[in-house]
Each structure stands twice: as C-alpha cells, then as structure tokens.
UniProtKB/Swiss-Prot annotation:
Pathway where it operates: Phospholipid metabolism; phosphatidylethanolamine biosynthesis; phosphatidylethanolamine from CDP-diacylglycerol: step 2/2
Identification of the protein by name: Phosphatidylserine decarboxylase proenzyme
Membrane topology qualifier: Peripheral membrane protein
Catalytic reaction equation(s): a 1,2-diacyl-sn-glycero-3-phospho-L-serine + H(+) = a 1,2-diacyl-sn-glycero-3-phosphoethanolamine + CO2
Length: 232
C-alpha cells in the first residue's frame, strides 16, 4: 500500500453537508466546557460522532452499463416485487424492488445506481415510521428520483426513517449522472429503495451488507467485465 493510499484510508473526507453541524457541536462543547469542564468532553464525543456520521469515503465503482450498483451503505432489507410510488410514473404493475436500510452508523451519502439522465425528482411529505417497515415505502416522507438509464427507467426513492427527519437531494431534473455519483443523503438512519427494469436480475439477498457505489444489486445478464474506477 502506498503512502497516498494509507493517508486516504486513515483520513476519510467529510462531506460539506456536515460542516455546519460539526461546527455547531464544537461551539456548544466550548460553551458547556466553560460552564463545567466534564461537559466539554461530552460535547467533544458528540462532535467526533458527528464527524463520523458525515464521513464521505471514496468508492471504487464498476463502470458497466449492464450493472445496477447499490445507492446506499447498509443492509439489504427487502428483495421482491412491489408497486413503485405513483409519482415515478412507472405504472401500477409491481416491479422488482431492492431496499437498503441505513442505520445511524452507516455512511449516509447516496450514490446513483446507474449512468443516466434524471427525468423527475419529486418530494413527498409523510410520516416518520421505522424505515425497516415495508409500509414506510408508501407512508413515510420520501424523495423519488426517476433515472433514464441505458436499460430503461430506474426509480430511486430516499425514505426518511424514525430518527431521520431530513432528506437531501442536490441533483435536479435533466442532470446527467455517472454511476456511483453522489446525488444526496439522508440524515440519521433511513432507507433507499431501487425499482428495477423488468429484464434486470437481482444479485443480492436480504441480510446482505451493501456498499454504496460498489455492491452490485442487479445485472442484465451480459456483464462484460469492464474495468472499475475510483469515484472520489
């Protein structure tokens, strides 16, 4: 391992979305420490946790249009047919859905599962049920992204959870996304659903650990073994 790789693996970048929160925790720690010294260290523990939460590691993403890559870090919590949210305009027929649940210790940056153009971004208010529940797909607050990929339309839905109360999506309609490119995040535990085209074959199982930008969720049966690249 080179010195550059060692430094990269040791000092994981922090996403800019976390800067205000990290600064806020640090300032509060100073104020609490001024009141009582032990409170400073409690505040610093929370500050370090906030830094950890907003970590944004680089990922090595397979550059192959025949693959669908995980958009989130976490555990595969559901694999099976499900009707997509109406706002995606994918029809009323069930599609194969893969859900990845993120807990509070997961990296919360969301990445595009495919290369393509964003056709639609729709935010829907809703409840904040446990994101592991299946009904969270329809009842919880969510942000639905429709991507036109080389193999057809794919729906990616960011779902708020019991603790997560803030969905962030900085990509817009007509934006072009590369596979593995960051498009948003969800704070403090949540879920991402991927609705696949009919000809996609799922390659993961419930309970499996998924890594955003790296784990292959599905393929189209003609994987060519293209090279991988690091998505910073």
């Amino acid at each position: 391992m080179s010195l550059t790789d060692t430094i990269r693996n040791t000092f994981v970048p922090i996403h800019r979305e976390g800067y205000p929160f990290i600064a806020g925790f640090f300032v509060v720690s100073l104020i609490l420490g001024w009141l009582w010294d032990p409170l400073f260290w409690i505040g610093m523990v929370l500050t370090v946790w906030c830094i950890y939460f907003y970590r944004d590691p680089e990922r090595v993403t397979p550059m192959d249009d025949d693959l669908v890559i995980s958009p989130a870090d976490g555990k595969v919590s559901f694999v099976g047919p499900a009707v997509p949210p109406a706002e995606l305009d994918l029809g009323a027929e069930p599609r194969m859905r893969v859900s990845v649940f993120m807990n509070v210790f997961s990296v919360h940056i969301n990445r595009s599962p495919v290369r393509g153009k964003i056709e639609k971004v729709v935010h829907r208010p809703g409840k904040f049920l446990n994101a592991e529940l299946d009904k969270a797909s329809t009842e919880n607050e969510r942000n639905s992204v429709l991507i036109e990929s080389p193999h057809g339309k794919i729906g990616v839905v960011q779902i708020a959870g019991l603790v997560a109360r803030r969905i962030v999506c900085w990509s817009n309609e007509d934006d072009d996304l590369s596979v593995g490119e960051r498009f948003g995040l969800i704070r403090f535990g949540s879920r991402v659903d991927v609705y696949l085209p009919a000809d996609a074959t799922v390659r993961v199982a419930v309970g499996q650990t998924a890594v955003a930008g790296e784990t292959v969720l599905a393929d189209y049966g003609s994987v060519r073994g293209e090279p991988v690249v690091r998505i910073g």
